[in-house]
Amino acid sequence: MLQNGTVISGTLIEKPHSFSTACNIATQIIAQVASSQYGGQSISLTHLAPFVEVSRQKIRGEVARELEELGVSASPEKVREVVEDRLRDEIRRGVQTIQYQVVTLMTTNGQAPFVTVFMYLNEARTPQEKHDLAMIVEETLRQRYEGVKNEAGVWITPAFPKLIYVCLLYTSPSPRDAHES
């Protein structure tokens, strides 16, 4: 739905042009699905990972234009550093959108949506996408650890979305096992 676009409430939603927009659209999809069915929804952060690269390219273009307008040159390393700093901020905003949208959504049946977020780095198709997915997962876990403030201003851990992180441990066979095969 994110890669190919979708229709929500009679409005065509095209492929997002940034990570934060992809996060916003994902929460709109969650809201629509949750309002028309009982039970929960699961999403994988892997579906959002390609939009990190979309934002990276967009930010890189913005930085290049800003440097040109200022008549300033910067080393490729410095440009990359500025781009990655802005990208991390974009990821923070996008993850925060998901967090707050899911926490504050009420479906038409009067319930908060039962959302599960799946995080598995090996779903990524390329090394760059895996790196980008790792940044999303890191930010998701950081924000969950921090929590959200309740109406009294006290930090709490929200009930949703539920987080599932897959961690595969690889143990190499002992040298003796290799000789026996």
List the model feature ranges, each with a label.
Residues V117:
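Conserved, mostly hydrophobic/aromatic
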Residues Y170-P175:
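Conserved small/polar residues in nucleotide/adenosyl-binding loops
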Residues Y120-N122:
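Active-site beta-loop-alpha junctions enriched in small/polar residues
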Residues A74-R92:
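Intrinsically disordered, low-complexity acidic Ser/Thr-rich regulatory segments
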Residues S36, G61-E62, E68, E90-Q111, ...:
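Structured alpha-helical segments in the cores of large, soluble enzyme domains
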Residues M1-E62, E66, G110:
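Catalytic alpha/beta core of large soluble enzyme barrels
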Residues R125-A134:
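A short acidic (Asp/Glu
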